[in-house]
């Protein structure tokens, strides 16, 4: 096999102006210079973010508001196993795809509007899990990272937040309990978490 250039959505030219890519299990995300997000591959759990579960071998633009608007002003993306997270310029985090373990960070496992589904087909804004927060949503985020079935975010103050599957303690909160909303990781003398360039 040899590498091939990714075609554009119409299949007649190539996807251009890409500044970042991230690969999930069977899907790929690309962030364009204009702040839009494009996805292709398997879409069983809505990981393409286009309000369908139909896979695509060509890039499709990620939408919000049940597919009516494009996800824009994105500065960073990260693909998990079958879910994705995106960081917007305003410091908010958006997530879509599989939510079986609460890895979308929207406050519930599964789909908040249809309990028969375990996924969200378009991005939803990540909520805050902090009891003392005056905000409903996670804010002032500067970096994100998706694990296979969990996610992390770093805010401007240096706080790390985690959410999703926690079967082996990957959320860093001294439990093995999953979290469907971001919780702040506590630092201390015995342990520290660092999220950034090395």
For each feature predicted by the language model, list its residue ranges.
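Signature of short aromatic-glycine-proline-rich micro-motifs recurring in repeat-based ectodomains
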Residues: 18, 23-26, 74, 79-82, ...
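Short glycine/serine- and acidic-residue-enriched loop/turn motifs that recur at repeat junctions
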Residues: 1-6, 38-62, 97-122, 126, ...
């Amino acid at each position: 096999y040899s590498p091939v250039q990714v075609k554009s959505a119409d299949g007649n030219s190539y996807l251009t102006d890409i500044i970042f890519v991230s690969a999930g299990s069977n899907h790929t995300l690309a962030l364009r210079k204009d702040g839009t997000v494009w996805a292709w591959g398997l879409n069983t759990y809505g990981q393409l973010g286009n309000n369908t579960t139909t896979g695509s071998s060509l890039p499709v633009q990620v939408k919000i508001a049940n597919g009516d608007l494009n996800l824009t002003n994105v500065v960073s993306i990260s693909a998990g196993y079958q879910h994705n997270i995106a960081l917007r310029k305003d410091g908010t985090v958006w997530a879509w795809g599989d939510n079986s373990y609460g890895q979308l960070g929207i406050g519930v496992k599964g789909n908040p509007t249809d309990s028969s589904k375990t996924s969200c087909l378009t991005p939803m804004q990540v909520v805050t899990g902090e009891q003392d927060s005056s905000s409903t949503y996670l804010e002032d985020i500067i970096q994100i990272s998706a694990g296979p079935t969990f996610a992390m975010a770093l805010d401007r103050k240096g706080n790390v937040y985690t959410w999703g599957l926690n079967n082996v303690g990957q959320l860093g909160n001294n439990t093995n309990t999953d979290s469907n909303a971001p919780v702040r990781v506590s630092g201390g003398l015995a342990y520290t978490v660092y999220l950034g360039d090395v």
